[in-house]
Amino acid sequence: MGIDVPLFRQMTPMGHRLSSTRPNYMTSIRLKSTIPHVGRVDLTNSKTMVHVSGRDAAKLLNGLFTLPVSSGAATPFSGVFGAFLNGKGRVITDAFLYTTSNHTEEDQSFVIEFDKAVEDELLLHLKRHRIRAKVKMEKLTDYECIFIWNRDATPDYWRRENECDSGFFQSLCEVAWSVAEVGETSEVEEKNGEPAQKPLYGLLVDDRYPLLGIRMILPAKTSTTYFSAIPSANLTQYNMLRYIRGTPEGSREIPPNKALPMESDLDYMNGLDFNRGCYVGQELTIRTHHTGVVRKRIVPFQLYQEGQEPGEYECQYDPELSGALPPLLDGSNVISLNSQPEERTFASSPFDSPKKEAEPKSEEAASEGGVPSWAKPKETDAAESNLPNKPKPVKLGNILSHHGNVGMALVRLDKIMQQQDIQLAVELPPGPNGEVNYLRAKLYYPLFVTDVSEAEAEAEAELEMERVRKEETHKNGQL
């Protein structure tokens, strides 16, 4: 594919009051203990792989994918992350698009890797737009999708070139792509009248976050043969790696036909190109980019106990707290506690650490009514609840996915920016007496966001734009 997306492009979100002195590419000590430094995970059971081939394959995909697709010759890293949108600009699914090892300009060959939960919908979307294009589409059932990471890698290992630099990934990439080269140039072994499978079918750098990892498509059950030296990992460890990196993925975190591309951080993860030609869903996306305000974003979060110190720069996994949490928190509300009567001193932003811990409460008081000590019930005094000026907690978003006390949430950043000394929490299931419980929460910048000062300036500009818009609306209403 003829696309050149800079791997280390600086990305700036709608900002918040965050210290600009924080380190980059820092990983939590507690989370390190659960995620191996080097790992290999098989994603085949959660993914669908569709092979799109034929003379018009690039033309078809170029009109549907959020990044440009070229019919040019394949290179070792000629694959990209992007999305397919519907006509209203909503995300059908995020996806990885590989140029396969046997791709040529005359016989184009691509593989789409995406969430298995939206398989039928995306296949219908592709067939609806195929019309008379010379394209063949089929599911790959005898291949596996492998993700490999090395958290000790440096940028020198990951330059987006036709070959890897020296270091850990040099041997990995050389083995992977040289195997594909041998498969193409050696004598074809006939087996039951069909050519033997090439050991490597697709390879790309997962550049949603710098140094995140590489993805490849191999014939089934061959990854252990070629990459046996890399420790095997599980899907939970892969998801936790994504949580700390702030990279949403799949239908749980990017709901089909509901999520908007920039609310889903596709622009931060190199998944959008605002300078390319037309594709389905482009109009709303481009208009939002140039004239609109992105009020929601998906961000990592950490739940922590009353009086506990959360991670300063990124979420920390707490096994003890995670074991005590209800099993299903997906969909739970993220709320502001600023309306609570208890005295609390917190940082000026949900992205900063608390300046002062809340006063500790006795175990007896905290566990009264069967409520665990880490889940403090909201006080609902009848006299106070009838006060006319007493505001209620404001819903700011909801949890999309989580593992224990860490995960991803979709939140209203515009409301968070408007509140000073904001205190955030996540609502838990009601207690035995019907009381509403909550657990403290902290939100984090995705770690690929490096220019905090520019992000803050962008946020202030968006708030000013919203203020001017309201004034104009008010004036027009008086005329």
Swiss-Prot record:
GO terms for biological process: iron-sulfur cluster assembly. Keywords: Mitochondrion, Transit peptide. This is Iron-sulfur cluster assembly factor IBA57 homolog, mitochondrial. Residues 341-395 are annotated as: Disordered. InterPro entries: TrmE/GcvT_dom1 (IPR027266), YgfZ/GcvT (IPR045179), YgfZ/GcvT_CS (IPR017703). One of its GO terms (molecular function) is transferase activity. Gene3D superfamilies: Probable tRNA modification gtpase trme, domain 1 (3.30.1360.120). GO terms for cellular component: mitochondrial matrix. Belongs to the GcvT family. CAF17/IBA57 subfamily. The keyword Mitochondrion applies. Residues 353-364 have a biased composition (Basic and acidic residues). Residues 1-99 form a transit peptide. PANTHER family: TRANSFERASE CAF17, MITOCHONDRIAL-RELATED (PTHR22602:SF0). Residues 341-351 have a biased composition (Polar residues). It is found in: Mitochondrion matrix. Its main location: mitochondrion. It comes from the Eukaryota. Signal peptide: none annotated. The gene is CAF17.
